[in-house]
Amino acid sequence: MKPVILSGPVLKERTTLRLGGQALAEVRLDDMHAFDGLPRVLERLGGTPAVLGRGSNILARDGELPLVIINPALKAEPEAWADPQAEDRVLVRVAAGVRLPVLLGRLAAQGLSGLEGLAGVPGTVGGAVAMNAGSYGNDMGSVLSSVEIFSAGTGMICVPRSQCRCEYRHFSVPAAGGWFVVAAVTLQLRRSTATAVRDAMRSNALLKKKTQPVTEHSAGCVFKNPADGISAGRLLDQCGFRGRGKGGMAFSSLHANFLVNKAQGTSDDAMDLINDARHAVERATGHYLELEVKIWPWQ
């Protein structure tokens, strides 16, 4: 199957923060064979490649954007088999386009433990790996066994966890030599019971609903927590940014590290709030807050 090319996708319609102008094109990859034609398609279209799943950690700028969106839309059913190296472990291969909540539902039904903390986190499996998404003590890197990636320099390769860099909200594959697309991942999970896994997921999801604006248009946490372990949300709280807004954008009144689109906000409003918060926190506490949300185009 060849890549499917869509003209002029509007990122406001493709990101959970509901911001963003029009990209040059979107290249949708519906199966593994479609990756073969990707380099030629990108060369013909021009622009900067940008990989997009559900757009749940993206702040896209308004206006015309020199981006070609790559959408790894593979959604084959997860496959599971016993780990030959560990009796209490199960390996699960998942396509990048599978939504994270769908995967968690499958894991709960099979009593497979390791990602309960990500209950309530939106996005796709590929996107979760690409940013090493994590919550409540779990992250994708901690259960990653291998990842199948495509890059212009390598083609499709399977990379073991030992050859990946999994850091706090960061994931990279040095062998890729530049941009790459996650096509599928294999996770190593612990055997548990369906009841225990479901109960943990339910508890984590309920806690998120109480403490995070999960029903509003947001892109998750704006800033990473500083390396000394202090919460970025607490620093923003101390500096008076909980609930502070500009135009249609505001820091959530429920959790200060979430930026929400209240009413037709703009990317300029969002960037002004982010820059104001960064400067205020650095002046008051000495902490320079590093972005967790991805700004498109990159700065």
Curated annotation (Swiss-Prot):
It is found in: Cytoplasm. Keywords: Cell cycle, Cell division, Cell shape, Cell wall biogenesis/degradation, Cytoplasm, FAD, Flavoprotein, NADP, Oxidoreductase, Peptidoglycan synthesis. Residues 19-192 form the FAD-binding PCMH-type domain. It comes from the Bacteria. It catalyses: UDP-N-acetyl-alpha-D-muramate + NADP(+) = UDP-N-acetyl-3-O-(1-carboxyvinyl)-alpha-D-glucosamine + NADPH + H(+). One of its GO terms (molecular function) is UDP-N-acetylmuramate dehydrogenase activity. Its EC number is 1.3.1.98. Belongs to the MurB family. This is UDP-N-acetylenolpyruvoylglucosamine reductase. It comes from Oleidesulfovibrio alaskensis (strain ATCC BAA-1058 / DSM 17464 / G20).
